[in-house]
Amino acid sequence: MGPSFFSVDADAPTFPAALRQLPKPPVSLWISGRLPADGERLLAIVGSRAASIAGCGLAGRLARAAVGVGLGVVSGGALGIDAAAHQGALDAGGATFVVLGCGIDVVYPDRHAKLFAAAVDAGGIISEYGPGRKPHPGQFPVRNRIVAALAEATLVVEAKRASGALITARRARELGRRVLAVPGSPGTDELCASGVARPVADERELLAALAGVEAAPAAVPASLGPLVAALRSGAARPIDLALRMGATLPEVLAGLAEAELSGWARRLPGGRFEVLRAN
């Protein structure tokens, strides 16, 4: 993170108007870099710290897609989904904003020093905590309301049922913002099943959701056609899929890896896999 920072009080003209909608807005903000400009469109992308490789890859792709249609990305700077989303926005040449749950001069986690420095150059680091404030578990759920308020929509990519990302989603819903979620994890499945979130499986569906329209059915990639067809007969272990398809086990394992990364399948407890899309 850059060495300089400044503060803005809640009654200042430059204080983000979106944060004034909060029941308990911050008394002041500390900033390194800049605050989002008036009218700047942001998508919050949040999720698990202990995210899967596939989840992080998808978060990065979704962030790049959002930047491609003129949105910046805001998140909490944590390990896993947050970091992947910030990096995806940076890779696409877009703005990204990190909202800290600690002091403005504290890099947490410390391995994100380069990521935060890049975020300052492309957007900003924001905190309601002044210099020297150490990270504390109780500060991160409070921080999440700022993430939700700054964004026009919140996207949860991967989360457990008891996850800070779900707090962000609930805050977004309370503020009348759109909530989106990638199916395939306990927390996101719960958001979708309860009607809190609109399901989003890939970049195409994200852009349709942001535009407020229904996405056209996605075509199954040719390389995954037989595997997806086999999965539609029911969740199964790789060896059982190989028997269904008349394929070798290495071929099935390679296909499952591709299907997970592209959002067509997910791994279940017990080593089984199931299809994720109805199309």
Explain the meaning of each model-derived region.
Residues 2-279:
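Glycine-biased, small-residue-rich flexible motifs in mid-sequence functional cores and linkers
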